C-alpha cells in the first residue's frame, strides 16, 4: 500500500476516532443524566443533542467538558503506548495511530483556546458555565503548548524511527 493511501486512511481513522471518543463521552454523560435527545449528523460531523432544559448549569458544563477530557486521556494513553505501537509491523496501523494521536493531542486544545471565538462557542458555551471563559482559554492554551511539545519531543521522533524500520 502506498504512503499516500496510508496517510489518507490515517486521517480518516483520526476523524472517526475523534468523533467516537469526544462525542461518545458526551453521549455517555447524556445517557447517564437522562438528557439524551438525538444524534445530529451535520455534513461530515455529528453532534449529541440533549434536553438542556432538564440540566442544571453544572450538569451542562460537565456535559460540555467530558468530550475534551476523554480526548485528553486518550491522547496520553497513546503517548504512553507509542513504543509498543512503533514496534508493530503494520505500517497502516502505525499511520492510523499516528494521526489519531495528533488529533487527540491537538483538536480540543486548539478549538477551546483559539478557534471557539471564531466559529461559535460549542463546548465552550457550556464549560463557561463552570469557569470564566478567559481562564478556560488560558488553561487550554497551556495544554496546547504542552501537547505540541509532547508531539515534537516524543511522538514525532518515535514515529519517524518506527516508519524507518
Residue ranges and their predicted role:
Residues 2-20, 90-99:
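Alpha-helical transmembrane segments and their helix-start/interface "positive-inside/aromatic belt" motifs
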Residues 10-60:
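Small-residue-rich helix-interface/hinge motifs
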Residues 48-162:
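Metalloprotease/metallohydrolase-associated module, dominated by Zn2+-dependent proteases
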